[in-house]
Amino acid sequence: MVVLYLAFNAVLYAGFSVWCALAPRQTSSFLGLAPANPGGESEYLAVYGGLQAGLAVFYALALALPEHRKAALLLSLCLYGGIVLLRTIAGLRLGFDALGNARFAYGLEIVLLLAAIALVVRTPG
């Protein structure tokens, strides 16, 4: 189960990173972001595309190096815990309908957080 979870995350983040790199205006618009200038687009590419690429590599390395799988699960717990917490705060402040397309990600992030919790508890080491 751990291998499937890590593989899913690696593929998920690789896909998002490629999408951000190939179509930054489309992806930022999909998220409700609009770069004000080329510097904003550069920042979007670095923060969204670059971070997603780094996460994809991290999860892929954890797949290849079993001794790092528990660390990858702990990262997932922290990552999705923070994302779900802040997205929940945004939903409560603004209304969940105001989250736009992020509502779809929110559901997936909750599932990935719950899976991370279950896997951390069940994985020795």
Predicted regions and their residues:
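Cytosolic juxtamembrane helix and N-cap/initiation of the first transmembrane helix
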Residues: 1-13
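Non-cytosolic membrane-interface motifs at loop->transmembrane helix junctions
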Residues: 96-108
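Membrane-interfacial loop-to-transmembrane alpha-helix junctions, especially the N-terminal start
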Residues: 69-79
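Hydrophobic transmembrane helix segments
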Residues: 12-38
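Core segments of alpha-helical transmembrane spans in multipass integral membrane proteins
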Residues: 40-63, 78-82
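Short juxtamembrane and helix-loop transition motifs at transmembrane-helix boundaries
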Residues: 31-41, 66-71, 92-95
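Transmembrane alpha-helical segments of integral membrane proteins
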Residues: 82-93
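Membrane-water interface at the C-terminal end of transmembrane alpha helices
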Residues: 111-125
